Every structure is written in structure tokens, then in C-alpha cells.
């Protein structure tokens, strides 16, 4: 079962996040699935997830997720990923900068009856905001 769940999550990355095929969500997610990404706002339904992911793709048209690690246990799969993209559209109210961002994140997936019922994304958006020039870059100072 773990191999099957990992395969479904890999499809989520390959087909939905990297290829932008949002219609695949209808196949991979339960009808009442919840998508939570605190950086992008309140929890969303399947349709809300499609809108948020489309907005992210609009802001970063070359957006690319690379799965660094994938672990499955019972009805859960956890992924560690690297996200990279260049901002060519508005993102969280920030006008396009043309800057490329790279950050790390983790996502937890909970399955019900072989489909994703819940997604929780935790990504380092502070680093993204620094790379976009919205927040100052912290530098170490000698003691």
C-alpha cells in the first residue's frame, strides 16, 4: 500500500504541480478533500486548491518542485521538496520582480480509500519573500 500511495503523491508533483494539469486533482483527491497551505490563506476545497495552484503558477510560470524525500506510513505520505521559480506575475500582492526563488518545504498527505483527503503544505515563504526583496536578508555579525 505504501508504494501505491507514494506513486499517487509523485503523480501529484509531476502532473499537477510541475505540469499544471489541475484537472488531475479530480482524480487524485476525494471530493471533500481539504488543501491547507497557511502561507496562501485559509483551508481550501478541491476547487479552492485549483484556484490557489493556478495563482501560484501564474505568478511563477516556470515553477518546479523537486521531490527530495518521500516517506509513507499507514494512510500518510510526507514529502520534503525544493521549490524553484521566477516571479513574472503578482504573488501575495507583490508586483512581478523577475527574480528567481528557491526554497524548501514539506507536505503531509492523508489518504482515504486510495485518494488524497487532506494536504498540509509547510514551505519556507520567509526565504521566498527575502529572495523577492520584500524582507531584508539576515546576515551574521561577528561576536
List PLM regions with ranges.
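C-terminal and inter-domain tail/linker signature
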Residues: 1-143
Amino acid at each position: 500500500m505504501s508504494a501505491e500511495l507514494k506513486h499517487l503523491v509523485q503523480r501529484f508533483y509531476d502532473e499537477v504541480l510541475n505540469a499544471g494539469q489541475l484537472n488531475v486533482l479530480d482524480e487524485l483527491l476525494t471530493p471533500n478533500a481539504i488543501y491547507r497551505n497557511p502561507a496562501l490563506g485559509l483551508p481550501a476545497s478541491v476547487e479552492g486548491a485549483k484556484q490557489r495552484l493556478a495563482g501560484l503558477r501564474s505568478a511563477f510560470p516556470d515553477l518546479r518542485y523537486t521531490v527530495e524525500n518521500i516517506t509513507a506510513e499507514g494512510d500518510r505520505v510526507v514529502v520534503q521538496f525544493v521549490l524553484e521559480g521566477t516571479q513574472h506575475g503578482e504573488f501575495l500582492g507583490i508586483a512581478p520582480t523577475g527574480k528567481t526563488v528557491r526554497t524548501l518545504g514539506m507536505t503531509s498527505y492523508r489518504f482515504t480509500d486510495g485518494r488524497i483527503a487532506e494536504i498540509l503544505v509547510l514551505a519556507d515563504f520567509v526565504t521566498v519573500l527575502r529572495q523577492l526583496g520584500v524582507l531584508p536578508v539576515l546576515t551574521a555579525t561577528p561576536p
